[in-house]
Every structure is written in C-alpha cells, then in structure tokens.
Amino acid sequence: MAHPMATHPRLQRRHGARSGSSRCRHRRPVPRRRSRSRPRWRAARAHRRHHRRSGPGIGDHPADRARHRRGGRLPAQPRRAAARRPDPRGGANTDHHAAPRHRRAAAGTSHRRRDRLASNDSQHHAHPTATGPRPRTTVRRRRQPRITHPVGTADHRTRTALRRPRPADQLSAALRSALEETRRLSGLADQLLTLARADRPESHPSAKAVPITPLLHESVARFAATGADITTRAEPDLFVSIDPDHLRRILTAVLDNAITHGDGEIAVTAHARDGAVDIGVRDHGPGFADHFLPVAFDRFTRADTARGGRGSGLGLAIVAALTTTHGGHANATNHPDGGAELRITLPTPRPPFHEELPRITSSDTKDPNREHDTSDQ
C-alpha cells in the first residue's frame, strides 16, 4: 500500500511521479552533484597554452612524468619570487605570472631586448678595436661612399636633365657635370685596380734601371701647363730600380696632392743618399694635422678637417703601396718652415755583374805525365 502523502498531486508534480513508475514514491530523489573539477580535455588545453606561453616547466619533461608515474617525487617547485623581475622604471618588482597575458608578453619582450643589448655592449667592451688594426668591415664602410657617390651623382644629374625639355645652356651644364662625375668614377676604378695589383706579388712587373730625371721633368711639365708654380732641383745621372709606369704614378700622385692641398710654390728635389734616391715634394700650405700623420698612407683616409677637398683617399695609399713593392718607403712630415713634405725613397739598381769567364773543358787541359812520355820518345 502506497504512502498516503505520495498520492498528493503537488508532490507528484514536484517529484515527477507517474503511475506505474518504479521510483520510490515516499523518498525524495537526491540530485546528482556537479563535479567542480574541469574536464580532462579542458585541463589538457590549458596546459598546452601555458606550455607555449612560458616554456616547459618543472615536471613537464618526459623523464619527470615517468618518475611521477613510478611514484617518485618531482623536483622542488621554484619560489614565486624567483619569477619577479625588477621594474626598469625604479618601481616595485613586477610579477609576470600574475599579470595578464598581453602584459606578460610585452614585459618578456622588453627584458629579452634589454638582455640582448647588454650582451652586445659587453662584447664591444671585451673586444675593443681602437687599439688594434682596423677590421675589414671598417675599410668596407669607408670604401662604399667613395664608390657609390660618383655613380649616384652622375645618374641623378643625367635623369634631371632628361626629365623635361630644358634650354641648351642648362642641358650642356648638366651633361658637363655628369661627365665630370664619370671621370671621377673612372679614376677611382683605376686607383682600386692599381691597389689590387700591388697587393698581389705575382702581378708585379719586373724592375728596371730607370733614369729619374727625364720622368721627373715630364711630370712637372704636365702640371706646370695647368698654371702650377713648380721648381725642380735634381742631381744628374740618377737611376732607380722600379717599373717606369709605377714611377710615373708615384710622381703624379705626390704632385697632385701638393697642388690640390698646398699653396704657393712647390719645390721638387731629387738626390742620391746611402745607395738610394730620395725624392722630396714640399708645398707651402697649412700642412698635415698631427692626428693625420700616423694614418696619412692608409686607404680611404682623408684629412678633411685640415686640408679639405673631394679626393678619394687613395692617392697616398697608392704611393706607399707601389714604393713598398719595389723595396722603398714613403714618409709624410711637416716642414719646419711650414707646409707639408712628402719624401719617397727608392733603391738604386745593383751594379752589373762581371762578364763570365770562359769555361775550361777537358780537351783544353793537358796531362803533364803524357807530355813527359812524349818528350822521352
């Protein structure tokens, strides 16, 4: 017999009782309790997100997981304070794990950039280059503007002249300017080729006994035709051991340097001294700056602050390279009476060898014993 309260309509509507139901009608059913733990798939997804965001943590390594399955203990968890970084603005420390995701990412990026800059700065201080030889990258950085500037200038002026119709005088001026830059580029290419050949011993031409006086007067006459005031004083019958083309380049470079940066009269001297010939070129300009003298013969180096100009910085470098190739040396100084002075020392040719004596063969010699035997007969 059913409980009398179980047949009440309100209780039946509340508990969902039905006629013929097997549910116990006198007891209120207990609802299922919802679990507070997340589903496994959701926990795995959160773990993967954290792993991608912060990298593998303690216990994530396969060896740690295997140790945990065997009942072993995982390594000790780091303290939360270890994850706190000092605030670069001088404020309180920032807990990156407690901050939102976008702030954590921004803070991590800034710290990584700061660490990278600090590492680069420490490497720079650990390997200084100011006291050692200049690296090749420095030479390349100096070389690039010298090569690209004439090309860019000629290209720009030519395109500007052809952009729209212009009067004949403006077009002629633009073309003359482009031609000047083209000549500068051609001269720069020639200088670079000369330096490249000087660096290769197998490409050096054979040295000859060259009289210096005719070539010196030839170079001086070529520059004097442009209006330069040059005086020459050279001893007669001076010979140097060098290639004639290299000697012309050396004389042209030192005279061009004196005319470009000097002022007034230019004095050229040549005399013999200690088995060599000393060539001196002195101008009456402001002279070399003290800081420029140690690097006067370096490539792509110019004393712009002291002597101004638009040179390529290769003239004196070519002089030093060609002089050293033939066993000489170059020196740059300031004259005591004012002005800059360049001195080139070149070796004199070796004295000619004596003529070889005729070789004595066996047929020319006579056996004294044989002569004695013949006389006896």
Curated annotation (Swiss-Prot):
InterPro entries: 2C_sensor_his_kinase (IPR050980), HATPase_C_sf (IPR036890), His_kinase_dom (IPR005467), Sig_transdc_His_kin-like_C (IPR004358). It holds the Pfam family HATPase_c. Autophosphorylated. SUPFAM superfamilies: ATPase domain of HSP90 chaperone/DNA topoisomerase II/histidine kinase (SSF55874). It comes from Mycobacterium tuberculosis (strain CDC 1551 / Oshkosh). Its EC number is 2.7.13.3. Residues 146-350 form the Histidine kinase domain. GO terms for biological process: phosphorelay signal transduction system. Residues 84-98, 352-377 have a biased composition (Basic and acidic residues). Keywords: ATP-binding, Kinase, Nucleotide-binding, Phosphoprotein, Transferase, Two-component regulatory system. This is Probable sensor histidine kinase HK. Residues 10-54, 99-115, 137-146 have a biased composition (Basic residues). It catalyses: ATP + protein L-histidine = ADP + protein N-phospho-L-histidine. GO terms for molecular function: ATP binding; protein histidine kinase activity. The modification Phosphohistidine is found at residue 149. HK is composed of two separate proteins (HK1 and HK2) with a distinct N-terminal sequence in strain ATCC 25618 / H37Rv.
